[in-house]
Amino acid sequence: GEAGLHPSNIHDNAYAVGTLDLTGDQSILLGPDGPSLGGFVCPVTAAKGELWKLGQLHPGDTVHFQLVTLEQAAEIRNAMENTINFQYTEIPLFQESDLSANYAVLSQGEVEGTEYKIRLDGEENILVEFGPMELNIELRFYAHVLMSELEKSELPIIDMTPGIRSLQVHFDLNQIDAKQMAAKVEAISQNIRNLDEIAVPSRIIKLPL
């Protein structure tokens, strides 16, 4: 990979709860006590309505992942929430969806010549990526400025995880869905201009301390 000897080792990738993290030749399902950022590839994230199953797993268990659409994931989540509220409904079972490789890409475009992609990261997170997978201070600035602008917005954001060239946005699924959030973030991204004129807080550290 770009950041290490193993193909799974990339520069940065934020982690959502329920994400499958490929750490070298080992796969790890990240729970709520797992890290929020690291340098390994995360190909899929469990639907929110299925997260309870993670707590039932034991070492050595075999897990089969089945692709679902956002709409199907919402049905599963709603059925689970109804059950929690003693409104028992049958949890829907779906045939595996035949999704294209681009299904998770909610939006893509350019900002002043720099390409960006907004990807699905489970149901309640989106991942905004700027430029190619490489160390680049200009791409870092894009992610930093976007995070600063989102912090000033009134969007229902729970938290954000910045990477080197990316930003994961965790939002309140009860107020906005992933496609709506992606559209809001894209609109703000399009207003990022004149990075050469942007100043960010910094400090000088002299070594040895």
Model-derived features with residue positions:
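Glycine-rich active-site loops that engage anionic ligands at enzyme catalytic sites
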Residues: 1-209
